[in-house]
């Protein structure tokens, strides 16, 4: 069984299932769920911008990303939390378990289209543009290549399992965590 003050990060690209998994983990283990995407969306709404507009705005205003990151790091210090966000694994230095979810872009586009009520083609284009913008922004701001998965403890292609199947895999990993494991040591570079 995992240690007290458990900290888990769940990262992945749009439509990979990070929110679904994070909610399941939080509910099952009684953890708080901190969602970087929601923080980002709330900030966009506060500025009266669409997500796409705010994405472009954030490229020119690094304080946006830094505020999202600061909130994630603060939540991790409190413990008993699942932190969901593309950079959560990079930002939370000593997470007990760092998870990356992936799926082919077509599968992710289908999921996003269903969730947002748009065509698969439109979702595909939005995802591709957003990922290009994010990758550039993370490289410029932190020197992080979002495609570098070397810091993650568990990488899952969510197109191969149902959400329940993905959770079962992650639950097994959490339930068998070594309480004196590496806690992310040596695997990651310093950020910010």
UniProtKB/Swiss-Prot annotation:
One of its GO terms (biological process) is pyrimidine nucleotide metabolic process. It is found in: Cytoplasm. The keyword Acetylation does not apply. GO terms for cellular component: cytoplasm. It comes from the Archaea. ATP binds at residues 12-20. InterPro entries: Cyt_kin_arch (IPR011892), Cytidylate_kinase_dom (IPR011994), P-loop_NTPase (IPR027417). Pfam families: Cytidylate_kin2. It catalyses: CMP + ATP = CDP + ADP; dCMP + ATP = dCDP + ADP. GO terms for molecular function: ATP binding; CMP kinase activity; dCMP kinase activity. Its EC number is 2.7.4.25. The keyword Nucleotide-binding applies. Keywords: ATP-binding, Cytoplasm, Kinase, Nucleotide-binding, Transferase. Belongs to the cytidylate kinase family. Type 2 subfamily. This is Cytidylate kinase.
């Amino acid at each position: 069984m995992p240690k007290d003050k458990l900290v888990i990060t769940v990262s992945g690209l749009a439509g990979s299932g990070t929110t679904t998994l994070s909610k399941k983990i939080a509910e099952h283990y009684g953890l708080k769920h901190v969602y970087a995407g929601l923080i980002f969306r709330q900030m966009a709404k506060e500025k009266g911008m669409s997500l796409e507009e705010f994405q472009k705005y954030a490229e020119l205003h690094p304080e946006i990303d830094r505020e999202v990151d600061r909130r994630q790091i603060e939540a991790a210090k409190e413990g008993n939390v699942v932190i969901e966000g593309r950079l959560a694994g990079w930002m939370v230095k000593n997470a007990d378990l760092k998870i990356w979810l992936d799926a082919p872009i077509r599968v992710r586009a289908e999921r996003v289209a269903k969730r947002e009520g748009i065509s698969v083609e439109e979702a595909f284009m939005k995802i591709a543009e957003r990922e290009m913008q994010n990758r550039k922004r993370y490289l410029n701001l932190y020197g992080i290549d979002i495609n570098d998965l070397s810091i993650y403890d568990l990488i899952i292609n969510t197109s191969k399992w149902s959400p329940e199947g993905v959770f079962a895999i992650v639950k097994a990993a959490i339930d068998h965590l070594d309480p004196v494991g590496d806690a992310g040591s040596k695997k990651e570079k310093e950020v910010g």
